[in-house]
Amino acid sequence: MILHYAQSWEDTHLLKQIIGKHPAQYHHMIASGGDHAFSLVKFGVEHINLVDSEVIQLEHIQSKIKALEHPKREILFGINDVNNGLLHSGRLEKYLRKFSAILPLLLRPGARNSIIDCISKEERVRIIKEKWETKRLRLVSSLFFSKKNINDIRHPGLSSDISKSPSGVNYLENFKLKALQYPIKENPYLDYIIHGYHKNSSLDYLKKSWAPKTSSLTLIHQDFFSYVKKLKTAIHFIHASDIMEGTSSKFNDRLFQAVDEVSESNSTFLYWEHRYEINVPESFKKKWVQINMNVI
């Protein structure tokens, strides 16, 4: 089974639904910032291998694990601090905080508070139409989240190959779509974009003083392709995140093949198709079934 979805960050609600419907024997993920893995372990996944070619990413996750067990975890994560903490140290987060700082100038008065207080979808539709539909927001967001700027703030390894066709993602329209779909209090990622920190929400793994068991996460310093190639055949859950956006089509074909070779029936392969279109080999399409995102 294959899945791709266009999100800038991990959509943990979606991942939980997928794992709940399509259980696997083994779980493997690009390490990234670790937030997605923490959420899934808290959700009930017993063990996840987190793989990354960058030592700094693995060290960042280790720091988060230690912070989760610390009595001053809120300070270490920067839960109520827009400038300091483990939640704010990424390149993307720093860029989003710049946008959140100027956002009030682009909206009609009271726009941010109004959308936060909305409970029903009907209310959010009305508020976005009345207070968020401004020429200033459309202009500045198109410049701020231009293809060039997004490529510049991504990790260098994720923008090394830009020969693929751009996906034409419209960040503002995606933002509105997600704002309409869920209340801000239930969507920490939109809350972060609006305020520069989780002002009205919280990441699920940061609730109720939770910390992962020592045995639940294994951090592996290795490139993802080499790692996948060495897996034993089984029912796998393999999450490649957005690494294929920064690699050539030829390399991506090899990764698809490697995933296919180690995966038994009912395995799941996930990847982001965010900034660039990822071409799936015909041989892969014949063996795998694409998940219909509308029925997850």
Feature annotation, model-predicted:
Residues 24, 222-239:
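A short acidic, Gly/Pro-enriched loop at the edge of an enzyme's catalytic core
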Residues 50-55:
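Conserved acidic E/D residue at the C-terminus of a beta-strand in Rossmann-like folds
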